């Protein structure tokens, strides 16, 4: 069939636009912009790392400062959105599409993204406003209007509109439904049709259950989100990190080889899908952007509600996000997938969360997939309340 004669549907237009936006424009904006901010700030993210940790611990906090949540709760609220399925499923997709070298470019994007987050979240404190209930709020929709002026309000409205369709919570629910279907619904033949596929009713009911659980948290506002995130984030990172260390310890002999492969493949582009160097770089940058959100503006909403009068202090706290999210959690996932060798195995060629599940099954037999399921539930839940 001649694809040139196929009608240009809305889905095709959306895909063409997405492929273009997530190509060279994204590379220039994220890496180029991040490099500019890094040099312009005279390498603030790296020189003031110790000071940022002191701020996070509350050394300079004043309970009388304006805001709704403390520095730690603000960072956890931001991390609840960033440390999600992008760290588990997104890394697996990056390795499948761009090869091991994509991880290297995720690191590059995270390093320069620290400066981007520093400036973005400093602006969130410098130019913030109040919502209809009188609570202090921040984010691009506020500092565009407060900083640039009311004539730029259409840009703030556009940000909100495109953010709504930016797929952020969709990926979380999609991957969570996928692993729940594979591990529970299909084996128990719950809501399964004659072709052994989960029915729309089963997926819909699971979606309703997720919506109810998330609503209980987000209806309490930024304060409840901050409190839940402050308890959930340390637990899920510790659980996921502990499981990962067990897997890496049992495959310790393969870890040095996996690290070497990341650096060598970063410049050769020998991807699983047969990609080239440009595909490796763009894949790494895309997944890093989705994972740590540096430059996307969403993180500024959480940090904009922090209790502080010093914009730079919150910027220093915010820049820890890409380091925790990409340089630590994403790297752990990548090393698990590479050291266990599941990314090279043939079969159904699963990607996303199912590929990571195979790595957990191989690294921790029997219990591995169920431990990952708990992690996925926590990561997805935290991300969806963070995006709210």
Regions found by a protein language model. Name each.
Residues 1-85, 95-102, 113, 249:
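N-terminal alpha-helical transmembrane segments of multi-pass membrane transport
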């Amino acid at each position: 069939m001649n694809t040139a004669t196929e009608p240009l549907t809305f889905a095709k237009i959306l895909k063409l636009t997405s492929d273009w936006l997530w190509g060279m424009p994204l590379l220039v904006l994220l890496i180029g912009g991040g490099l500019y901010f890094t040099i312009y700030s005279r390498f603030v993210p790296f020189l003031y790392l110790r000071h940022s940790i002191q701020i996070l611990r509350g050394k300079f906090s004043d309970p009388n400062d304006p805001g709704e949540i403390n520095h730690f709760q603000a960072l956890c609220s931001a991390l609840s959105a960033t440390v999600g399925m992008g760290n588990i499923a997104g890394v697996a997709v990056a390795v499948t599409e761009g090869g091991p070298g994509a991880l290297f470019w995720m690191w590059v994007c995270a390093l320069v993204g620290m400066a981007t987050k520093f400036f973005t979240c400093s602006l969130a404190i410098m130019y913030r406003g109040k919502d209809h209930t009188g609570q202090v709020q921040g984010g691009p929709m506020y500092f565009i209007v407060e900083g640039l002026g009311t004539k730029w309000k259409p840009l703030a409205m556009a940000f909100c509109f495109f953010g709504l369709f930016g797929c952020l919570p969709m990926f979380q629910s999609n991957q969570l439904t996928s692993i729940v279907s594979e591990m529970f619904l299909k084996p128990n033949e719950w809501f399964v049709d004659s072709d052994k596929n989960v029915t729309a009713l089963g997926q819909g009911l699971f979606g309703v259950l997720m919506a109810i659980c998330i609503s209980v948290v987000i209806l309490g506002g930024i304060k409840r989100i901050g409190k839940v995130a402050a308890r959930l984030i340390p637990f899920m990172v510790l659980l996921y990190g502990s499981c990962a260390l067990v897997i890496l310890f049992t495959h310790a002999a393969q870890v040095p080889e996996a690290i070497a492969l990341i650096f060598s493949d970063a410049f050769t582009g020998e991807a699983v899908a047969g990609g080239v160097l440009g595909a490796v770089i763009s894949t790494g940058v895309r997944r890093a952007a989705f994972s740590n959100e540096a430059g996307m503006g969403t993180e500024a909403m959480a940090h904009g509600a922090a209790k502080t009068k010093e914009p730079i202090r919150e910027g220093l706290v915010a820049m820890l996000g890409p380091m925790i999210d990409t340089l630590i959690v994403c790297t752990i996932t990548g090393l698990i997938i590479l050291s266990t060798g599941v990314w090279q195995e043939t079969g159904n060629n699963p990607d996303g969360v199912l590929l990571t599940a195979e790595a957990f099954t191989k690294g921790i037999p029997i219990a591995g997939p169920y431990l990952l399921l708990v992690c996925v539930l926590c990561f997805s839940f935290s991300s969806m309340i963070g995006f709210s």
